[in-house]
Amino acid sequence: MSRVGKSPIALQGAEVKLADGAITVKGPLGTITQAINPLVNVANNDGTLNLSPVDESREANALSGTMRAIIANAVQGVTKGFERKLTLVGVGYRAQAQGDKLNLSLGFSHPVVHQMPEGVKAETPTQTEIVIKGINKQQVGQVAAEVRGYRPPEPYKGKGVRYSDEVVILKETKKK
């Protein structure tokens, strides 16, 4: 059995409902509904969730670990939330959050406007910092990757949009 799948999930004050092959996790920040694979059993035991594979097949073992991680992320999302920080490095690179849109000035001849999906918010504490917040870890990471994709860090000067914890290894320029 999967090592990840064996460990129980502490609910941390979130409410869980199991119905029709789906799990609904409700917390102070919102609600997430996730379909449960039929190869995985989910049991609610007084504030903890335990997952186990239906049979001992390799696929069921793998899916029990995957489902455990997805449900644990949903519990963390509705209780604490997720955030991803981005930094803009470069002369004239700026960001500004306006409602559900993120306006980026990234050295193109036109401003880049990124529409935020439902459930994800962007904040700009400074003009060169972006904080993307939400309850769905997959959505937050996807939006951060899309924003970074407009101008990924280039390897010679390091200019571009990067994650705040990302280390860009700079190349040496060509010598004559």
Swiss-Prot record:
Keywords of the record:
Ribonucleoprotein, Ribosomal protein, RNA-binding, rRNA-binding
MF-aspect GO terms: rRNA binding; structural constituent of ribosome
Q: Which Pfam families match?
A: Ribosomal_L6
Query: GO CC terms on record?
Result: cytosolic large ribosomal subunit
Q: So which residues are the signal peptide here?
A: none
In terms of InterPro entries, this protein maps to: Ribosomal_uL6-like, Ribosomal_uL6-like_a/b-dom_sf, Ribosomal_uL6_a/b-dom, Ribosomal_uL6_bac-type, Ribosomal_uL6_CS
The source's superkingdom equals Bacteria
| BP GO terms, sorted | cytoplasmic translation
Subunit comment: Part of the 50S ribosomal subunit.
Give the protein's biological function: This protein binds to the 23S rRNA, and is important in its secondary structure. It is located near the subunit interface in the base of the L7/L12 stalk, and near the tRNA binding site of the peptidyltransferase center.
Q: Which family does it belong to?
A: Belongs to the universal ribosomal protein uL6 family.
The molecule here is called Large ribosomal subunit protein uL6
Organism, by scientific name, is Burkholderia ambifaria (strain ATCC BAA-244 / DSM 16087 / CCUG 44356 / LMG 19182 / AMMD)
